[in-house]
Amino acid sequence: MKKFLLASALAVSAISFAQIGFSSTRFGIIAGGNYSGVKNAHNPSGPRFAFQGGVLALIPIGSENQFFLQPEVTYYGAGETGKDKDAKGVDGYNAVYANNYLSVPIYFKGYFSEAASEFFGMAGPRFNFLMSQNVKNVPVIRPYYDPDFQDPLYPNVNGKASKFNFGLGIGIGYSYKRQLELAARYDFGISNTYPGLDKEPKGTTKSKSEQVLSVTLSYIFN
């Protein structure tokens, strides 16, 4: 948490001293696929495939056509399933633990040169606000994975997802004429997605953080 706050403070300080060209902001749309999982949460545990899509802004930093801020507002599917490749036929294999967010990442984006078509890298924080949680087919022996179920034996244990979480994202991509862009990203979850599972019987107190690998395609308007 301290590292995250320090990184955010440094980013804000850097931005405050940079020449940000809000008047030259361009807007665009973005869509892609997510491959997500949650560490230390469910058993069995496997990946979930989901969708993301929304809008973005490209805000110049400095006079060169090379460095930008790219905030986004997207629908962002994450969570996981029970489809562990080594758990076929096991109770809970068909479970779904879907978390759907309104997500707001803020990337620092740098193209490798000022050329019209060029590779780029990006990094920055991501803030997720839970819109809905869809859970089904939980293991019979772990009914508390269902956020609507309260086990009288373990009243403090539940599978409710946090209303808010955050992480750090990195990515690399290619831009065709600074309009059509393809990118691969990885979001490292930092906060605890399922604090109610920290006291799970025979579970772990390690943070249940979401990790998301995604591929996105965006179009930026002139």
Positions of the model-derived regions?
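Transmembrane beta-strands of outer-membrane beta-barrel pores
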Residues: 33-37, 75-79, 100, 110-112, ...
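Residues that define the transmembrane beta-barrel architecture of outer-membrane proteins
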Residues: 23-25, 47-51, 98-104, 162-168, ...
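Extracellular loop and loop/strand-boundary signature of outer-membrane beta-barrel proteins
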Residues: 39-44, 89-95, 154-158, 199-205
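Glycine- and aromatic-enriched membrane insertion/assembly motifs of diderm outer-membrane
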Residues: 25-28, 35-37, 44-92
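Transmembrane beta-barrel domains of outer membrane proteins
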Residues: 56-60, 107-111, 171-175, 218-220
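Repeated loop/turn-to-beta-strand initiation elements of outer-membrane beta-barrel proteins
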Residues: 65-67, 116-119, 178-182
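Membrane-embedded beta-strand positions of outer-membrane beta-barrel proteins
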Residues: 29-31, 69-73, 106, 121-123, ...
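Outer-membrane beta-barrel "beta-signal"
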Residues: 30, 207-222
